[in-house]
Amino acid sequence: NNKINRFKKNYYLLVLFYKKNFVCCGWMHETDNWHISEINTDIKTNNLIVLFDFFTVPKFRNKGFYKKILILIRNKRTKKSFLIYCLKTNIRSKKGILNAGFNFKKEIKKI
């Protein structure tokens, strides 16, 4: 199972609860290289902390929980930088990322 392998490879699952309800989760991993499966492209990450594969429970969407979990992660005390990405067509994810204080660096295209 892909998710079990992530734990074996020291990936971290980040989970947000609200009033005892699971509302949002995503993955975090520190690495030198990263494969963006959505566009089948490998990138050099130089030990960035990669944030990826986030999910918000449908009934909790559009309530700011994605932004909240990203702000909590961004405020983590670390000297490392974060890399977070989404598809160009995923307007809501892009909005949440920018509203959480992350900056747009560049567009990566399929090679």
Question: Over which residues does each language-model region extend?
Answer:
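Short, basic/aromatic recognition patches
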Residues: 1-13
